[in-house]
Curated annotation (Swiss-Prot):
Protein name: Type III pantothenate kinase
Gene Ontology cellular component terms for the protein in this record: cytoplasm
Transmembrane segments: none
Entries under HAMAP family matching the protein: Pantothen_kinase_3
Amino acid sequence: MLIIDIGNTNIKFGICINNQIIQTLRISSQPRRTADEYFFFLNTMRNQLNTNNFTITHIIISSVVPSITKPMIELSTHYFNITPTIINNQHADICNIKIDLNDKLLGSDRLASIIGAVTLYPNKNLLVISMGTATVFNLISKERSIYGQVITPGAHIMAQSMRQHTALLPEISQIKVNKVVHNTLFYAIEAGVYWGYIAMVEGIVKQILHEENKDLHIVATGGNSILFIDHKNFIKNIDPDLTMKGMIYLHNMLFNK
């Protein structure tokens, strides 16, 4: 099976065999790319696999960028002769998940992550933190009801905003920085973004725990979740592939596997 997770910043492809993600490829999200270009990227990934009999028989897509969804559907139908499964809010009902929010529209990536979390951690009150372009804190009851949320900028937006709104500050990447105080401009900005993001997430988690006043099983996913590998004192479960795992679980439910 081919898994395609289309985000605002990156597109992540995954090859799944026997419910296991065996290969992934991440590229930047660029709406003007064609189905032919995506097929080239996929061939590069497939050529790295040490298997001669692998055939894509199913494709499932999560997308928050409609302009990229269209060429991905074309990729699926033209090159693989497959009508892909496109995740939408109706799939919440299939997975026995209730969206108990005033705004019922939920991003497909969020839904996939939540499907993954409630499947891996059943009968638990959950706080699922999706760390992508935006950072989304999802509260899910042990009865599988999505009842609360907090949405903040992601680390990438924080770094990008610094560059866009200042004339002289250098461009930086959001990477792990061992200490917060530096005597050079570049590292001072990197440390500010990294430790500022860590402090923001930790502070919001603490406030959520205070307001909820109950045990929450906390899971972090998304590209920026790896920034918290050394901060497991308040986020013990870090799973960058949780969204893709949720897509696999949904596929299995839809096709009775």
